Amino acid sequence: MEKRRLLSLDAFRGYTIASMILVNFPGNWEHVFGQLRHTEWFGLTFTDLIAPFFLFIVGVSVTLAYRKRLEEGITRRSMYAKIFYRALKIFLAGMLLNILGILDNFSFSELRWTGTLHRISIVFLVCALIYLNTGWKKQTVIAASLLTGYWLAMVLIPTPGYGKPMLEPGINLAAWIDNKFLPGKMWQGTWDPEGILSTFPSIATGITGMLAGTWLTGKADWERKVTGL
C-alpha cells in the first residue's frame, strides 16, 4: 500500500531547515539582520523559533509514526526498545559532534554533554512514551503542567546564594541547576540553553506537536483543521 505523507509537515520541515541554514550562514557576520540573531536574553527573534520548530516537528512525527503502528496492531511493549534505541542513537550523534569539535585538544572538562541533538533525543523519547500511554486530553494536561511548573519554579524558587528568585542569565535557578549537576563545559560558560530545567518546556513543545498531529490526522475536513490549528 502506498505510504501517504503529510505534505504540510514536509513543507514545514523544509522551511525550518532552510531557516536554520540562513541563520547559521548569513553571509557576513558583520552585517546581519536583527531577526537572524538570537536575542540577548529577554524578547524573541525569528532565530529563537528555529529550535522550537524542530521540537514541534518531532511531536507531529511521533503521532504520525506511532498512530500507524498502533492501528496495525503492533504492541506498545514491542515498540519501547526501538524508541529507546532511536533516542540513544540521536543522543550519541550529538555527543560525537561535540567530541569532534574539541578533538585536537580533547578534555572531558571541555566536553559539552548537551546540545540540539541531545535535546531532540530526550524530547522524542519522552513524547513517544507519553503518546503510547495517554490520550490527547492527558497530553494537554501534561504539557500545561510542564509549562506552568517551569514558570513557577523560575519566578518563585530563590536561587541558592541570592536569597530570592533571579531571572538574569547565569544566575537564575536553571543556571544554578546546570552548574550543580551538568558535567563538562556549558555553552555560555555559566549556563546552557539546552540545560536540565529548560528541557521540561521543550518536552511541552514536543507534546504540542503531538496534539497538532492528532488533530491533522483526525476526521475533520481540511478547512476545520486549518481553523483549529
Predicted features along the sequence, with ranges:
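Long hydrophobic alpha-helical segments that form multi-pass transmembrane helix bundles
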Residues: 136-208
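Membrane-interface interhelical loops and short amphipathic "cap" helices
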Residues: 26-45, 76, 100-114, 164-174, ...
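Transmembrane alpha-helical segments and their boundary/interface "anchor" motifs
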Residues: 48-53, 68-98, 102, 108-109, ...
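Hydrophobic cores of alpha-helical transmembrane segments in multi-pass inner/ER membrane proteins
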Residues: 51-62, 120-132, 201-213
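Hydrophobic alpha-helical transmembrane segments of multi-pass membrane proteins
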Residues: 43-53, 113-117, 193-203
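N-terminal signal-anchor module of multipass membrane proteins
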Residues: 1-71, 75-79
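Transmembrane helix-loop junctions in multipass membrane proteins, especially transporters and channels
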Residues: 28, 68-73, 102-106, 136, ...
